[in-house]
């Protein structure tokens, strides 16, 4: 298993490195930590799909890429703070095998065969979390700061509901399962 924790700008570089090292050989299973979307031929492209496309273009045909999704910050993980993630692969057996391998008493893993749904959700969740985080400032301007401070959760709840709905639409658009958004 090779774990790829690179910036989204490094996808081309890592494809080149994998081709150099594994030219003519089987590439081990890959696990992408990198999140995001790219544009290819005027369409959104998941970074796992981009890496697969680049490797295929370079003649590597046997590629098995998994991805990690979920709220997990490196600093928390380094300090063994309880974290929960999902390992996704189009082959559920591979996803389970990797999830079992990585699971610890503080790094809790589940698994999914909805690679697209997990990747899209992971890539866009922070956009929606920022909107929810802005709820305090977005709630009614017709109330005092004191009342707003105590009652902004109605606005936050409405934003969470709308965010989930929009994530489901986007996930389905990129060929994932909308159920994956809710876990």
Task: Put a short name on every predicted segment.
Residues 2-3, 126:
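N-terminal Rossmann-like NAD(P) cofactor-binding module of classical short-chain dehydrogenase/reductase
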Residues 3-80, 98:
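Rossmann-like NAD(P)(H) cofactor-binding subdomain of soluble oxidoreductases
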Residues 21, 54-64, 82-180:
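Internal alpha-helical scaffold of NAD(P)-dependent oxidoreductase catalytic cores
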Residues 69, 182-183:
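Active-site nucleophile and cofactor-binding loops and adjacent substrate-binding regions
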């Amino acid at each position: 298993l090779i774990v790829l924790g690179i910036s989204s700008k490094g996808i081309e570089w890592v494809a080149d490195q994998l081709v150099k090292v594994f030219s003519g050989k089987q590439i081990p299973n890959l696990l992408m930590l990198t999140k995001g979307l790219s544009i290819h031929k005027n369409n959104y492209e998941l970074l796992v799909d981009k890496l697969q496309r680049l490797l295929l273009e370079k003649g590597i045909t046997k590629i098995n890429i998994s991805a990690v999704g979920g709220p997990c910050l490196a600093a928390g993980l380094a300090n063994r703070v309880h974290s929960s993630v999902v390992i996704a692969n189009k082959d559920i057996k591979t996803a389970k095998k990797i999830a079992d391998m990585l699971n610890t008493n503080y790094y809790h893993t589940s698994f999914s065969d909805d690679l697209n749904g997990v990747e899209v959700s992971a890539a866009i969740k922070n956009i929606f979390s920022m909107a929810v985080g802005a709820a305090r400032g977005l709630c009614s301007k017709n109330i005092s700061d004191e009342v707003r401070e105590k009652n902004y959760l109605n606005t936050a709840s409405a934003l969470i509901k709308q965010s989930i709905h929009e994530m489901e639409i986007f996930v389905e658009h990129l060929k994932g399962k909308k159920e994956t958004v809710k876990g």
